[in-house]
Amino acid sequence: MSLPPEKASELKQLIHQQLSKMDVHGRIREILAETIREELAPDQQHLSTEDLIKALRRRGIIDDVMKELNFVTDSVEQELPSSPKQPICFDRQSTLKKTNIDPTRRYLYLQVLGGKAFLEHLQEPEPLPGQVCSTFTLCLHYRNQRFRSKPVPCACEPDFHDGFLLEVHRESLGDGTRMADSTTMLSISDPIHMVLIKTDIFGETTLVASYFLEWRSVLGSENGVTSLTVELMGVGTESKVSVGILNIKLEMYPPLNQTLSQEVVNTQLALERQKTAEKERLFLVYAKQWWREYLQIRPSHNSRLVKIFAQDENGINRPVCSYVKPLRAGRLLDTPRQAARFVNVLGYERAPVIGGGGKQEQWCTLLAFLCRNKGDCEDHANLLCSLLLGYGLEAFVCVGTKAKGVPHAWVMTCGTDGAITFWESLTGHRYIHKPTNPDEPPVAEQPKPLYPYRTIGCVFNHQMFLGNCQPSDAVETCVFDLNDESKWKPMSEEAIKSVCAPGATTSLPPFPPLCASTIDASVTSNEIEMQLRLLVSEHRKDLGLTTVWEDQLSYLLSPALASYEFERTTSISAGNEEFQDAIRRAVPDGHTFKGFPIHFVYRNARRAFATCLRSPFCEEIICCRGDQVRLAVRVRVFTYPESACAVWIMFACKYRSVL
């Protein structure tokens, strides 16, 4: 529903007043602090956490608190990015939902209280009510918890005002049900990973910044409250350039019975940094020695793509094995092939580079890749390998080249029977590898490879790294017996474990869990279909043609679209016979039927329509001339985790042939 600008402005003001009356942040402070601390008499303030909980249970206060502790959070925080998102207007009231908080657990309340010095947006005009504009969204991950801020208009001083309640707990040693004390929390080295995403007016996403927040300074602050100024740096080639500043406030709930001295906190952090630096130094020394030995096998190895380290979005060199980890998708993905389809529908985009030259290297951390919903081939391969490892397969990322020597990464799985399967993460295609023998006589028939890969330099996963030391690095002649050290030179698994195992170093970004889609497939399918009908009608009107839609014919296209997606997910074709039979019955004798299916991984109808018109066959259908022309279009959106989606569109027409 569109509103006049004056009405939209009035509605926006009323919403703002109502949210101010609710005082969300104040309610969090008052209920937790007063209920848990001030309800006890002053002489009992020395009680331990266990005694405090027992006293609250005896008095029945916990039951009351569980009923009363309802905090209002914006449901947009729980949404995940998609590619692309619908443009955002700022004259609509957000949907609010309530969340319960357990007063027996320890929480870190992180507030983002505005931003400043985002100088790239210095001249950005303030958006008018109802105007579509570019937005910033802040995504957070901490110990398997993910959050997302409300989108705010891009500005020099973006109006971030969000609060995130992060549960702090130990997940092992039987401490999962105990409230963490200061000493326990000091030993939890996981940082808070913050990713800033920009979404333009067309729904395209850009990674602006990726920052790891060290939150434990709050443990040495008075009353467990501290304020920080976080300077966000750019990504890739701009990783040394400041993009903006965020004002952040950290509070512990319930308040700490005992705060640590700042000196103790600083000493712990310094010790962790020192241990991490020493482990990384020792691994670097080992990697150099391994590389020297690899070159001594054959000097030509120097030209092979043996990738031991790779730069992340912040320009930090990390061992490639740290980009992969067994990842379980819970109930979001059922099979390895469905996982491959999910990775395939995430957008592909090479890292941006300023000026000409070669490819810019940027292997994104998993959170940055998921929040942006697109990345390079290495990002896709790392995610697919992690998911396949989670399904119990022996999976590796392969680094090599495609045709014309273009660097590329893909995934390989090794079966228990020795079968080697390549998985192309950008398309979801699978290829069986059967090596050719270069010593066979020319007359011998050799299997022709169907895969697009030409050379392979190394393979790796979270535990192993192996360099290809066979006489030729051509994939078609490669033997993938990874236990044969005459063909594959391994790195020490202990050395890899020292820097890549979970918790081995504090510099390792933790892996976030996948989140379910927030897209309503039926609603989105219908919206895109209606937009395409309008675009087709306008296009035909410009050509002087009338448009008559046939709803029944449109409906009959649905089984075909479902069949196409099923085939992409399972590699099995099904249901085509019923579709063809239905179409034959729907098209009268003497009439001609034409259909054009096409697949996208974005939900922008206008962009999809422009792409379709570039196909001569599709243009022939859309611009069909003849007797009794009836047009049909069907859209089917298939949703996947992280709000990724596969969009299938089929245009069709039937007309009476006049010759």
From Swiss-Prot:
GO terms for biological process: regulation of centriole replication. The keyword Phosphoprotein applies. It is found in: Cytoplasm, Cytoskeleton, Microtubule organizing center, Centrosome; Cytoplasm, Cytoskeleton, Microtubule organizing center, Centrosome, Centriole. Gene3D superfamilies: 3.10.620.30. The keyword Phosphoprotein applies. The modification Phosphoserine is found at S75, S83. Signal peptide: none annotated. It comes from the Eukaryota. One of its GO terms (cellular component) is centriole. Keywords: Cytoplasm, Cytoskeleton, Phosphoprotein. Centrosomal protein involved in regulation of centriole duplication. Required to limit centriole duplication to once per cell cycle by preventing centriole reduplication. Belongs to the CEP76 family. Interacts with CCP110 and CEP97. This is Centrosomal protein of 76 kDa.
